[in-house]
UniProtKB/Swiss-Prot annotation:
The modification N6-succinyllysine is found at residue 68. The thioredoxin reductase active site is a redox-active disulfide bond. The selenocysteine residue is also essential for catalytic activity. It comes from Pongo abelii (Sumatran orangutan). Homodimer. Its cofactor is FAD. This is Thioredoxin reductase 1, cytoplasmic.
Length: 499
């Protein structure tokens, strides 16, 4: 078949999108606005335990949305404890009901799935619950869950297939372990849980499971939160340990065995040290794997049409306009090589791509200074460079790190967690002390970080922060009064909420 410019009227669709997650749906709705004929193919391959879900991708079904709701469940448990100090008479034995939480979370997700279906229908986007595979230039095969196949053609294609959790490849992992894909709809309380991994998924799940009263252990191969600021990562780990989450460091599981079937059952985990011959064993009700995620790019026929991928990671290299090496095929989201794996990034990239393709826009997605939040018990918000990356980029002598602990006023009456919340900015002294890294550990870190992210985009400097009057008494005001540098070695401990 010839190129898209030769036979425009011969295609079934202007754009076929493989993947109905946040990025794919954003691109579909945007393209449809410009009168284009668009199809979305979305298919969820069940997990080894058989878990599947509806339209909307990872974020809505098994990611950000259920994760934040369960984090909120844990925060409410803490709020109940705090409330006694504020005069509320709360029963001593407050219990958490797993089934009720799961039902509420799944009902909300179901309403979102339905909302996406309706939105596509209203915009006249054709949606098929089918697995898409390239079978030749401009052609794709769609296979539904009954095995029925259809062939479609399109002028352009967008790959937005996302990622799925990785397994260990050891005896018993797929038979007996769960992943985050299973956790948010788990029909029984997981009980005593081992979480394997040190990713943000691992630590967030550990945090909210412990927060609702479960016995939680995290098994870590090396460092926490690889790729994030390690100063912040270590503070998160310390706080979690102080709040009863156990860490087994420098061990990896080599075998998982079932001792007793049930919901939950009992499992034996055998693990080996990463730096010696030492072997340890432990018994748990549930083992949750959170060791990373792999791009869903290897079984969609990319080799048939010549799309290059990184053979090691499965990631797709693209131009700054999200174009693959095959001109009529584009890619967005978590499957891109060397790009940030976050829902809002995929949404932005999808919308802007459709605007460039169909509305004459030239605006490209900006992958720099993307804000993010890790919803651990002590939330971590970040924007810009980690301290390690700033040193690597500018040299240690050319950066100044301002930092301070702070104590949220609301925590002073329950008298908890003083000198645990932490604020840090990293400035480039060769560029007017421009803020190149923003980091905050504390309640509502995402809400705090979002506004500062806009300021960083505008070229925020330390002088501008200093001349900004803070709102009192809130956590974010600490950023208007940062005066102690790391280099000075001076104390940053706080005696009260107002420093």
């Amino acid at each position: 078949m010839n190129g898209p410019e030769d036979l425009p009227e011969s295609y079934d669709y202007d754009l076929i999108i493989i993947g109905g997650g946040s990025g794919g749906l954003a691109a579909a709705k945007e393209a449809a606005q410009y009168g284009k004929k668009v199809m979305v193919l979305d298919f969820v391959t069940p997990t080894p335990l058989g878990t599947r879900w509806g339209l909307g991708g990872t974020c809505v079904n098994v990611g950000c949305i259920p994760k934040k709701l369960m984090h909120q469940a844990a925060l409410l448990g803490q709020a109940l404890q705090d409330s006694r100090n504020y005069g509320w008479k709360v029963e001593e034995t407050v219990k958490h009901d797993w089934d009720r939480m799961i039902e509420a979370v799944q009902n909300h997700i179901g309403s979102l799935n339905w909302g996406y279906r309706v939105a596509l229908r209203e915009k006249k986007v054709v949606y098929e619950n089918a697995y898409g595979q390239f079978i030749g230039p401009h052609r794709i095969k769609a296979t539904n869950n009954k095995g029925k196949e259809k062939i479609y053609s399109a002028e352009r294609f967008l790959i937005a297939t996302g990622e799925r959790p990785r397994y260990l490849g050891i005896p018993g992992d797929k038979e007996y372990c769960i992943s985050s894909d299973d956790l948010f709809s788990l029909p029984y309380c997981p009980g005593k849980t081992l979480i394997v991994g040190a990713s943000y998924v691992a630590l967030e799940c550990a945090g909210f499971l412990a927060g609702i009263g479960l016995d939680v252990t995290v098994m870590v191969r090396s460092i926490l939160l690889r790729g994030f600021d390690q100063d912040m990562a270590n503070k998160i780990g310390e706080h979690m340990e102080e709040h009863g989450i156990k860490f087994i460091r420098q061990f990896v599981p080599i075998k998982v065995e079932q001792i007793e079937a049930g919901t939950p059952g009992r499992l034996r985990v055998v693990a080996q040290s990463t730096n010696s011959e030492e072997i340890i064993e432990g018994e748990y009700n549930t083992v949750l794997l959170a060791i990373g995620r792999d791009a869903c790019t290897r079984k969609i026929g990319l080799e048939t049409v010549g799309v290059k991928i990184n053979e090691k990671t499965g990631k797709i290299p693209v131009t700054d306009e999200e174009q693959t090496n095959v001109p009529y095929i584009y890619a967005i989201g978590d499957i891109l090589e060397d790009k940030v794996e976050l829902t809002p990034v995929a949404i932005q990239a999808g919308r802007l791509l459709a605007q460039r393709l169909y509305a004459g826009s030239t605006v490209k997605c900006d992958y720099e200074n993307v804000p993010t939040t890790v919803f651990t018990p002590l939330e971590y918000g970040a924007c810009g460079l980690s301290e390690e990356k700033a040193v690597e980029k500018f040299g240690e002598e050319n950066i100044e790190v301002y930092h301070s602990y702070f104590w949220p006023l609301e925590w002073t009456i329950p008298s908890r967690d003083n000198n645990k919340c932490y604020a840090k900015i990293i400035c480039n002294t060769k560029d007017n002390e421009r803020v190149v890294g923003f980091h905050v550990l504390g309640p509502n870190a995402g809400e705090v970080t979002q506004g500062f992210a806009a300021a960083l985009k505008c070229g925020l400097t330390k002088k501008q922060l200093d001349s900004t009057i803070g709102i009192h008494p809130v956590c974010a005001e600490v950023f208007t009064t940062l005066s102690v540098t790391k280099r000075s070695g001076a104390s940053i401990l706080q005696a009260g909420c107002u420093g």
